[in-house]
Amino acid sequence: MGTLVLQAPNRHNIIMPSGLIPLFPLRVVVFPRTPLPLHIFEERYKEMVGGAIRDQSEFGIVLAHESGIGNAGCTVKVEKLLQMYPDGRMDILTRGQRRFDIVTVNDEKDYLQAEVSFFDDDDAAASPDLRAQAVLRYKELAALPVSQAFGEPDMFDRQLSFQLAQSLPDLDFLSSLLRARSEDARLKQLNHYLSEYIPRQRTIERMKSLAPTNGFGGKPAGL
């Protein structure tokens, strides 16, 4: 067992010291400061999470694909142990911490570990107009019947885009936001995405409401 080298990280903007962290591949994208509840049932992840709770340390969430894992992710810390089961399974609440690029993956333990390079945004302030537009579209999103929006956003968060995007279902899109080093760039991506996503969802909801009818808002003849 050894070390698998992944694609080299994109080294620009603010780069922070690297380190070795445990990895938890999942079909989910988590952002800094956003909550992520998890049910832990595999033995290897019981060990990993148990160590994180004991040491109050972080582990990395990376997007799992059929062909492997993404080359960027976000660490989380266990904020609360919600339930411990007799067989060692756990329900936990975690919260996103720091973003990272994967430099190398190490498989010497039962769970993956990786040498990572942490990064953050550049220091440029986000455009107030972009923020206002994104918040407006977020409120339109929250008004949809199928919305899973997370309540009122914290307008003082310098990375507001993460809050506004966390309930969206498109994991590839969320992964692209996670990797972006500019809040302006994320807000532009988010505004463009929502400008297409919201009308599409409205159309879907309207079609669902018409499905039991004859297409004109009334019941078919004979029913």
Describe each PLM feature range.
Residues N10-L223:
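N-terminal low-complexity, acidic/polar interaction/targeting segments
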Residues M1-R11:
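Intrinsic disorder/low-complexity segments
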